[in-house]
UniProtKB/Swiss-Prot annotation:
Lineage: Bacteria, Pseudomonadati, Pseudomonadota, Gammaproteobacteria, Oceanospirillales
Organism: Chromohalobacter salexigens (strain ATCC BAA-138 / DSM 3043 / CIP 106854 / NCIMB 13768 / 1H11)
InterPro entries xref list: KOW, Rib_uL2_dom2, Ribosomal_uL24, Ribosomal_uL24_CS, Ribosomal_uL24_KOW, Translation_prot_SH3-like_sf
Full protein name: Large ribosomal subunit protein uL24
Gene Ontology terms describing biological process: translation
A Pfam family the protein falls into: ribosomal_L24
Gene3D superfamilies in UniProt: 2.30.30.30
Subunit structure: Part of the 50S ribosomal subunit.
Amino acid sequence: MRKIKRDDEVIVIAGKDKGKRGTIKRVLQDGCYVVSGVNMIKRHTKPNPMQGKQGGIVEREAPIHASNVAIFNQETGKADRVGFQIQEDGTKVRIYKSTQKQIDA
C-alpha cells in the first residue's frame, strides 16, 4: 500500500513551489507525482496538421519527486506524515501520524 495515493491533497515542502497545495493527478513508477497546479512548465509544441493539432506554447504540470511533497492534514492545516494501522478485522488503513486519525474515512 502506498503512503500517498491518487486524489490525495498534498503540500509542497521543498523546491520552487514550496507552500503550494494541490491534488495528486498521477503516480509515476520512478517515485514522482504529478500534482495539479504545481511545478508548471511551458512546452513549445509544433503544429501537426495530420492530427489536427495546433502549435504554440502549452503550460502543463511536470512531475515532482515524492520527497518534496507531504500529505496535507485538513484538521491541523499543516503537512503531515503517513502511518499505517491494522484494524481488528485485519484491514490496513492509512493514518495521520500527528493526530492518529484515519485518512480514508
